[in-house]
Amino acid sequence: MDNKLSSENNQLSSEKILGLLPHRYPFALVDKVIENIPGERAVAVKNVTINEPQFQGHFPERPLMPGVLIVESMAQVGGIIVTQMPDLPKGLFVFAGINNVKFRKPVLPGDQLIITCDLLSIKRQRFGKVKGEAHVDGNLVCAGELMFSLVD
């Protein structure tokens, strides 16, 4: 493993993540970044717990993490990549689209999502695209491309 990747300096705590992203409870969906290459790649952890509000209605007898929240978790990891790029304007980057997102397996309370995002492109310093994947226990549960746009 590359020394720059193994350094604890390349990890981000939940407090540091709160400094990079505007999301707050109950929509802060990234607990820790375990690999961070600003402007290129991030690998993060989302611990899924039964105490999250979505499980009150999705579904009480068989709780499943909604797919849209898995995608949102991936988007937030992508946002961590983009917000650390010094040459981009500061502002609010929001979801602009998704391509080829596929859900492979259900995500349950007690699971730990490992989310990997790689920056694919930045255009006109306003639009970005990342490739995202989410795994549980080494199994792919969701993958796709996510697009972002800077809001004025």
UniProtKB/Swiss-Prot annotation:
Name recorded for this polypeptide: 3-hydroxyacyl-[acyl-carrier-protein] dehydratase FabZ
Family: Belongs to the thioester dehydratase family. FabZ subfamily.
Reaction(s) this enzyme catalyzes, per UniProt: a (3R)-hydroxyacyl-[ACP] = a (2E)-enoyl-[ACP] + H2O
A family per Pfam: FabA
NCBIfam families: fabZ, PRK00006.1
One Gene Ontology MF term: (3R)-hydroxyacyl-[acyl-carrier-protein] dehydratase activity
Domain of life: Bacteria
Gene3D superfamilies in the record: Hotdog Thioesterase
Main location: cytoplasm
Annotated active site: 58
InterPro entries: FabA_FabZ, FabZ, HotDog_dom_sf
The keyword Flavoprotein appears for this protein: no
Subcellular location: Cytoplasm
First-level EC class: lyase
Phylogenetic placement of the source organism: Bacteria, Bacillati, Cyanobacteriota, Cyanophyceae, Synechococcales
UniProt organism field: Prochlorococcus marinus (strain MIT 9312)
Role of this protein: Involved in unsaturated fatty acids biosynthesis. Catalyzes the dehydration of short chain beta-hydroxyacyl-ACPs and long chain saturated and unsaturated beta-hydroxyacyl-ACPs.
Entry keyword set: Cytoplasm, Lipid A biosynthesis, Lipid biosynthesis, Lipid metabolism, Lyase
One annotated Gene Ontology cellular component of this protein: cytoplasm
Enzyme Commission designation: 4.2.1.59
GO BP annotation list: fatty acid biosynthetic process; lipid A biosynthetic process
